[in-house]
């Protein structure tokens, strides 16, 4: 009988409560209760004792009295069944119900009350024990299932190559060989299908293989050839979207890369140390190996590591920066001096709301230093964008060329990207991490120091370009234009200033496009030890360019002067006649200038000859500078069309331009707080040599262009002679 059926009752001297134990008292050898020194009202009874209790046997006057026990009454089976039936209907009886029940069962109302309390407690305990048991069983089941899945992941095999699918469980070389083996096996199967078809036609039996339908060819992508070849060195192989077996691995890589980027962008020393320029941070490779022991792929032998970090305030909101990074046309335009070509091959994940949160896409890009002497870098990677919190975004790249058998590039992007945090007044705090491995054993001549120290593609180069481009965009969107007045100036309306800024922006965009996307014959001339790249473009039905054959000639050279000195000299209109052959020795005058950046040297200018009667041409000049690179770009424009555009409301996109100019870089020898190094200049001319849609290039045109560029280089070198001790 459970304890809930036994209720303690205080003994008030009522002998009716002792009737059940009369037999027990008689079996005590006729012992008188008074001889035990106990009052009959204090006699204890045990309702559980059904035997002839011998506990009072031998009790004498000289023996200490026993301790009192609580007295229990055992309810009858009828009472218990009645109360349980009532309990099922009403577990919480009120006072009236308890009194009625006590009268019916011959029990005290207090006994009824205690019984129901005990019954509720008993049921509650039983329910809790049952729930705990169920939860314990479920927990054990989940643990077993988790362990089973872990073992399954660890032992899973790639259906394509037969190798392990877990990242980091095998070396890069082993994984690449397995994929190559799977590709060769697939080719054998496809050849066997072809052989079977031939066998049916000729009647000659061939050895049979499992028949496999050849896959549909994916959309092709062809890497453009960079200057003097490219670091990719894969003979223009094509790639397409990743197959279904590779996508889970790509997603796992992207998620792991995002976790690594968040650490790299927020942890300071000892992971990051002082960089080459005193502001950027350089990666401590030993600490990196300790922090990321498993790593996302092994370090490749013969590859050189470049890793840096930079932080800056940018005049753009986080969502604007994210949109610019996730759309390849905006990305390549924003970083036109770094990204030569870019393409999105496939979007694996996309946000339904269209705000790029969670977007994951496969991309390829060609990175460049604007010089015919420097090979380009090609990369095939996945880009992943994720919002990390309110006003906080992260965008990360990681190379995936090792997962695809038909790509063999020599530039791998380890987790690289940026952390974008929203600030006040439409600004964003951008922390940029650039981490690549490159096999660039080739010679760079005068660019060797800049390239090998990692400065050419460092994080501060990306951030500096981003800051400068956002300043330019803000100036175009603003209606409060800052202009400079001079003694020989023209008055421009806001529409005229906007048109002039748009023309300057077109000059910059066309200059970079001419350096990157020109196709056709490429000639390298070694006259006077200078390599000159001459490329041809054909202009047809382009309202912003003259129709015919356009030559783009470019070369690079070194000057023994700091970049700021060279930039300030070349941008000044009063110095232009010293180096510009087209000026014919005549002075140029600045008649308008509109600032498009915080630095007043970032501006668009309008220049013209001192004697306007001798020339009907003007020059629109775009000057731009940041701590890593400077540009002086310009284009001759017709005075009449320019006057219509600035004052008559003409469309600036229809002003015919052929940009030329200079890209100025540090030579990589300068020290922070110490001696400044020299400058590396790339000069590029775009010229119309044959007009008309059916025009063809002539040898004399190439010779004239080469002579023009050499003359300009010689004049500039004479203005900055080498200082000897």
From Swiss-Prot:
Q: Which residues bind DNA?
A: 68-127
Would you tell me the Gene Ontology cellular component terms?
nucleus
Domain START per the UniProt entry, residue ranges: 243-475
Q: Where along the sequence do coiled-coil regions lie?
A: 117-201
Q: What does the UniProt keyword field contain?
A: Coiled coil, DNA-binding, Homeobox, Nucleus, Transcription, Transcription regulation
What the record says about disrupting the gene is: In plants missing HDG3, HDG7, HDG11, PDF2 and ATML1, increased cell division leading to cell overproliferation.
Q: Tissue-wise, where is it found? A: Expressed in siliques.
Record CDD domains: homeodomain (cd00086), START_ArGLABRA2_like (cd08875)
Listed GO MF terms: DNA binding; DNA-binding transcription factor activity; DNA-binding transcription factor activity, RNA polymerase II-specific; lipid binding
User: SUPFAM superfamilies this protein is in?
Assistant: Bet v1-like, Homeodomain-like
The family database entries (PROSITE patterns) matched by this protein are listed as: HOMEOBOX_1, HOMEOBOX_2, START
InterPro entries (alphabetical): GLABRA2/ANL2/PDF2/ATML1-like, HD, Homeobox_CS, Homeodomain-like_sf, START-like_dom_sf, START_lipid-bd_dom
Q: Where is the composition biased (Low complexity)?
A: 11-40
Polar residues: compositionally biased ranges: 46-64
Listed GO biological process terms: cell differentiation; cotyledon development
Q: Where is this region: Disordered?
A: 1-74
Report biased composition (Basic residues) as residue ranges.
Answer: 65-74
Which cellular compartments is it found in? Nucleus
Q: How does it assemble?
A: Interacts with AIL7/PLT7, ANT, BBM and AIL1.
Protein family: Belongs to the HD-ZIP homeobox family. Class IV subfamily.
Role, per record: Probable transcription factor. Seems to promote cell differentiation.
Cross-referenced PANTHER family, in alphabetical order? Answer: HOMEOBOX-LEUCINE ZIPPER PROTEIN HDG2-RELATED, HOMEOBOX-LEUCINE ZIPPER PROTEIN MERISTEM L1
| Protein name (Swiss-Prot/TrEMBL) | Homeobox-leucine zipper protein HDG3
The organism encoding this protein is Arabidopsis thaliana (Mouse-ear cress)
